[in-house]
Structures are given as structure tokens and as C-alpha cells.
């Protein structure tokens, strides 16, 4: 077809007439298959009078060349390259230039710089041109081609950085500035150490360029700010010397109320990221005060007159969830404070933040008081330990006072803060149930009918607080259940019913068996919602599935008769309703049921795993974001007619995604993947051998999700892979076979290296913590098999050592920031604790002799955290890790006695009970396993522990002293326990808090029976007293009871008089019970 005829067809497509567009589309698809179509399109893109036609032709040419470039003859390719560059130089319309630049980028992706020297010449000539329009065209072309293949430009980085240093200074040309920043955005992740001096020169100019762009075009400025994000994230320290200037610029924009919300929010997102990656430098450069003084007024800003913040509105039509979801600068400023709490040591943040908080909370303005409560809420996330130890009573009092504030705005914030406190300040906050529960119940009852948004806030706080109460919920159970069941019985909105059903789950988690009297009524309501066909009740249906899963875990056995019905119901709903949230909750239900049914779930596993595989593989909800230039997607499928021909062609070229500027993902689909991973991991462990036929396919899909951009999905995938290893190990134990062993070894061979890689390279601390926890679980479950490949033990020790030395990617700081600072953010301390938990597991898996050389490397790293200047949390972690590792080392710990004992003796005198408790436990296990080197120090150890038992008031520490004394008595070289010590130890029983030490006490009873039973005549009354107290207690290990009864039977038979005299000291009912158990009545 002639270009004139093609032009007419394209014109038809631009008309506002659907029928003509349809016909023209059909014709065009036929025309474009002809060989003459490409020359006609090239003619139009270069010479059509109408810019819309030129742009349309450029887009269609690009889409054709995308898959057909290599089929063109060499002369045709050269001719096209020349024609496009000429057209680009002549073009005066921006939209056409952009399409031509993208067409050039498509060819460049195929050819590279070497095969297209004219492109490089044009870039060099145009970007240095004295004429502004030509320079702008050059920078536009540069930004597009660099984005299409950034690695190809790495050899030219210095030249490009010098160019950007010039162009970013041209504040009179906003176009130049924008394309320069786009180019820098793409280059930043590829910068090397050699590029740093030149790249740093750009930072002040970047700030000036942004200051120029913001007043001209806020939308373009938002896009250009990506350059700052990329430089902040860069592995080379480009921003650090200019951190103060960058922060000042960000704060100026953030506080400028004359600007639009979009640019202020975008700059607050930059600040959030800056805090995350440059927290140490912020403190070092004293930038925290100006940051806080800017953020607080933004958080406290009042909405326009007559309006409310989004989260304070009570509109059923546009239901906003309880989380802060408003798209206003206020909510993003709160997120910056949250990030500060997560990444700064609380000792540095709280003293600067608290005076501002106190002033806000005293203010007459409800929005100031609200700001104070919002900041308190997010502070509990990152500085939870600090608040628990030092500030909880006064801060909780402030929050409770907020629940009774005259302003609804403040009451809403107080409910949010209480919900966050309940989530982040466990277990301490639960001890305030007497103060909090009456307030919450009164608030719940005061919410007027129909005010579901206020009800949602009240339920959020109530759920989070109640969920962790355990037995403390019992006094409030009748009132709580009446409130919830009333909401379900009475006519109320679907949202109110959904909230009540959700709250029932939290109440069940706390109440456990105490919920049984209400179980029939709850099930009646849940059944009604689960079987409903009403569309408006679908959220209630989904919530009912989730609560059903919670009930299965909470009430246990009484749910077993309903398990099969629940399973069928879940599968049926997945079949009928296509909804990611419904699937997510159904999978959680299946996981809960697997705990009850075990291998009884086998008949449904094929259906369940088929659904889960679809969820793991699904790309639903992942939406390509197209570059603003590509308004012509009519012909996405214009090559369909040639599909068969292309399939025959071995040289089919890949689709070019250069139009796609990114992907947006709906969170519900990420949540679905995360919960699928969690559920399938749990099901694999609970169903064991029955899961084996599905293991391989599920494993492969979960493994792929380690590359997922969403951190919660990566975290869940790592956790599931660990559970698969544990499930395979369990299957090998119950059903040993070569294929099962091979499957376990193959899984470990992939999972363990992926864990090591994640610890070293993953940037998100939450993911690394989850990986370390999963690794610990795999080591405990699979033991020596985890370490099978040669060198694996050394590799794992190296990875854990890197965490303790703060050398992993998620702990990374600029070299300039590296300086000794005793304070650290609580999340950084938690990361070290997770590594610490893996060390004893590794010792136990490797065996003492193999692990001893590596322990010698860990020892100085742990001991240095017990010194005088260290925090309580650090000392507790270090001493706890040492003590647990001594157990893993066993007899091999003897060689370390001289280095360990001084540390344990000094920390046993600490003021903090947890540190003392860990140190005393450590002494006991060192006495038990340390052999002769430890026995030399027994008099010193007894000299410390014996008097300490009499004066110690903390239950857990007393229990650990009992455990340590028991170990000392059993390890005594004389094999004869000292009567005084034995009497004092037995007098201190029963254990109150650390019930695990009953195992040690049980071993002591066996030791006494075997080595010196006659010696226990003097302590017979104590033994009988202990026996009468623990006999009916289910928490005491059966072996411990059996050992004590054996000892008492010996006494009753061999020393009858002494035994009967001791029996007389007990209450009559207890004495009779004991005689019956011993068969003496």
C-alpha cells in the first residue's frame, strides 16, 4: 500500500467514531502484513504533515521491528537506522521525538553501540550542541537509550557524568534538567567506586534542578525525584557528603503547604528512604532535630475547614481500613517517624522526641493531641523494648486518657495507638488488662448504631489487646461475648458483622478452652455466613473462614468432628468465588485443619495443592504501567496472523518491554501469595508422608518467589522452604526410604545455600531475621544432614559471623559512616539475636568436637557484648547464646572454661534478672559439661549460688539457680551431694516460671536414686511435699514424676519409719493420695 493510503487508514483511527475505528483496525491488520507496509510506515514517520500520524507511524514501526528486525536485509537495516536518526534531528514536536527515541532504543537493544556508531556520534554531537532544542533532543534520546540497556553505557560513565554535570546546571531549560535526571536515575544502580568523585559533583546540581522543576511541573518533578532515590540506594556512597543539603531541600518541600500533596508526599517518601539507608549519618551530622521539627507540624496539620482527615470520616460507602490510609502528607510524615523509630537507637531518638510529644499532648488543639498519639503509636514499633523497660506505665496512661478525650479525632488516634501498643509491647502490656479492658468495653458499648467506622477502630484496638491476654481474658469473657453475639444477632450492617466475626477470632485465641460454652452459638452464626449467597455479605463470609481457622487452632479437639465439613466448605467456596482474600483465608483454614487432621487431610491434598499452585504462579493483579507516550496500544496483537509462521522460525525475537515503565501490584494478590506460602509450609509438616507426591511441584513454585519484589512474600517463601525441609525429614523418620532421603538431601542442597545468600545479600532486615529463624529450625530438625556437603559448617559459621560483625547487606553503612557507636536500633539488636539463636543449633547439629574450632571464633564477638557499657538486651543475648552453645558443645566446652567462667560469674551479679538468669543457667551447663577444668571451680560456684538462692526474689532466676545447683550436685567428683545444698535446693521447689528445668530436676532425682539413695532420708519430708504438689500438674514432665516416685518407693520400703514420719507432715488428703499412688494404702 502507498503511504498516502496508509495515512488515510491511520486518520480513520483518530476519529471519534467506533464503527469506523473498528473497520479501519481490521483493514490495517491486513495491510501491515504486506512487505510494503514497513517502507510506507517509515515514509510517514519521516514526512507526514500531521504530527499525530508521524507519532502513530513511529509506534507501529517500533512494534513491527521489535520481533522482525533480524529478518530484514543488512542494507534495509542500515537505511532504517539512518532514516530514523535523520527524522529525529528534524522533528519539532515533542511527542513524536519521544516515539522516535523509543524506536531508536528498540533498534539499539538489538544492535548495541558497536554496530551503530552513528547513534553514538549523534548523541555526542547533539548533547553538546549550542542550540537548546537540539541539546534537549539529544538528552531525550540519551535518557531513552540508556534506560533500554544501561549496562552498555558503563564504559562511558565518566563522559556521561561530565555531561550531566553541565546539563544539570542549565536551570533555564527544564526539559534538559528532566532528561538529565532521567538518565541519572538509570545510571545510578550501575555506578562503580571509580565513578563516585564525578557522581558526587552532581548532587548539589540535582537539588538545584529539582528546585527549578517543582514550580514548573510538579508531576514531572515527582518522576525526576527517582534519581535521588536511586542515588540513596546506590551501593557506592554518593550522597553522604551532601546529606545535610539533601535533607534541607527535602524538608523545605515537605513543609511548603503552597505545593500540591503529590510532590510533598513524594518528598516524604524520599525522606523515609533516606532515614532507612542513612540513619547513622543523620545522627553523626546532627540532622535529627531539624527533621523532627519539620515533621511534627506536618503530622499535626489541621484539614481544610469543614473537612476531616480521611481516617476520621464515618462513611460506609467508602470504607477505610483502620490502618492509616489517607493519601495526605500527614500520613507519610508519620511513616518517616516510624522509620526513625525502626532505624535509630531509642536512646538517641526518644530524648529529642518526648518533649515535642508532651507539648502536643498538652495542647488545646485536638489535631496536636492526635499528632502526639499517632507518633506514640508508631514509636512502639521500632522502640518497643525501650518503651517496655522504661516508659510503658506513663505512656499507656496517656493513651487511656485519649480514649476519653472530648474530641472524636483524638479518641480515634488513641484507639489506633492502643492497637499498636498491643501489637508491639507484648507481653508487658497484657498485665494492664484491669485498667484497659473496662475502658475498651465501655467504648465499644458507646459507639452509636450505624457508626461502623468508629466501631472498626474500637474493634481494632480490642482485638489486638484481647488476642494476647490468655487466661486474663476470663473475667471479661461473658461481657465480650455478649457484645459480639449481639452484633451478629441484631440487624446491623455487613461491615459491623464482619468486625464482630473478626473479634471472635481474637477472643478465641485468648480464651482457648474457656470458649467452649459459646462454641455452638458461634458456629451457628459462622455457618449462616459461610453458606450465604448474598454478595453484600461476601466480606463477612471471607472473615468467617478466617475465624473458623482461628477456632480450629484455639479449641482443638471439639473442632475435629467438624473438620471434614469445614474442608469441603472451603474447597466449595474456592470453586464458586474468585477472590484473592477468600482463597487466602481458605488456605489458612486448611493449614489449621491440618493440625487437627494430620494425614487425614490426604484425600483433599490434590485439590488443595492444585489451588495453591495456581495462587503461587498467578500473575493476576500485576498490572504493567505503560510509559505516558504509548497511547497506541490498539495493535498489541497486530502480528497474530503471523503467529504460526513465527513459531516455525527459530529466530523469533523477544518482546521488547520498553513501553512498560514498571508494574503496579494489587496488595491483595501479594497477600494471597504470602499466606499461600505460610499455609502450604504448615500443611507439609502436619501431613508429612501424605504430602510427598505434591512436594516437588510446590517446592519449585515457592522457590521462584525468593525473587519476588514484595518483602513479605520473600519472607514467607523462605519460611515455607524451611518447613518443607522439616516435613521431608519427618517423612524420612516415619517412612525411611532411599527416595525420601534423596528428596531431603536435594531440598537441603538448595535451601541452605539460598539462606546463606539471603543473609549476605538481602537488604530488608525482616527478611533476614525470618531466614535466620528458618535456618535455626532446619538445623534443629535435620541436624547433621544440614551440614553434609564438605565445607558447609564453615560457610554457615562465616555467614553468622558476618551478622555479628554487622557486615551483611541489610546492616550495610557507608565507609565514611563507620565508627564505633554502642547504641543501635532495636531491629539491629533483634537481627543479632536471631543469629545468636542459630549458633547453639549449629553446635548441636555439628557436634562439640567439630564445632569447637568455630566457637573459638564466635567467643570474642559474644564476650565483647557483655562488657560494662553494653545494653541489657546485648548482655542478655550474648550470655544466653553462650549458655545455649555450651550445651551444644557438650564435653568439648571443657577447653573454654577459663574464658567462659569469668564472663558468667560477672554477669550473674547484674541488676537485670534476665541477664542473671541466663548467666546462672550458663554456669550450670558449664559445670555439667566442663569436666575437670570446671570441677576445679565448683567451690567458687557453690559459694555464689548457695547464698544467692536464699535472697533471690525473681522466680525465673530462682528456678535457674535450682537447675544450676542440680547440675553441680550431679557433676560433683565425689558423686555425693552436699546435704546442706540438697536441702536448700529441694526447699526452693517447685519451680515457678522456667518449667523446662523440671527435666534437670528429674535427672537429679534419678541420680539420687542410683548413686546415694540412703542420703535422701533426711530430706524425705521435702520430697513428699514436692510430690504432693506436682503429682496432678500436667505441665511437669512424666519422666520427672516417675523418677521422684521411684525415689519415694525406695524410701517407703527401705526406711519405712522415716517415710511414715515424713508422711505425717502432709495434710491427710495429700498423704492418702500419695500412699495410693505408691501402692501403700
From Swiss-Prot:
Keyword Transport: yes
One BP term from GO: protein import into nucleus
Each HEAT repeat, start to end: 348-385, 390-427, 431-471, 475-513, 895-932, 936-974
UniProt keyword Ribonucleoprotein present: no
Compartments (UniProt record): Cytoplasm; Nucleus
UniProt keywords, alphabetically: Acetylation, Cytoplasm, Nucleus, Protein transport, Repeat, Transport
Domain Importin N-terminal, residue spans: 24-90
Name of one Pfam family that matches: IBN_N
Recorded GO CC terms: chromatin; cytoplasm; membrane; nucleus; protein-containing complex
SMART domains to which the protein is assigned, alphabetical: IBN_N, TOG
GO MF entry, a single one: nuclear import signal receptor activity
Residue numbers bearing the N-acetylmethionine modification: 1
Gene3D superfamilies per the UniProt record, alphabetical: Leucine-rich Repeat Variant (1.25.10.10)
Similarity annotation: Belongs to the importin beta family.
Subunit structure, as described in the record: Found in a cytosolic complex with ASF1 (ASF1A or ASF1B) and histones H3 and H4.
Entry function: Nuclear transport receptor that mediates nuclear import of proteins, such as histones, RPS3A, TNP2 and VDR. Serves as receptor for nuclear localization signals (NLS) in cargo substrates. Is thought to mediate docking of the importin/substrate complex to the nuclear pore complex (NPC) through binding to nucleoporin and the complex is subsequently translocated through the pore by an energy requiring, Ran-dependent mechanism.
Protein name: Importin-4
Species for this entry: Homo sapiens
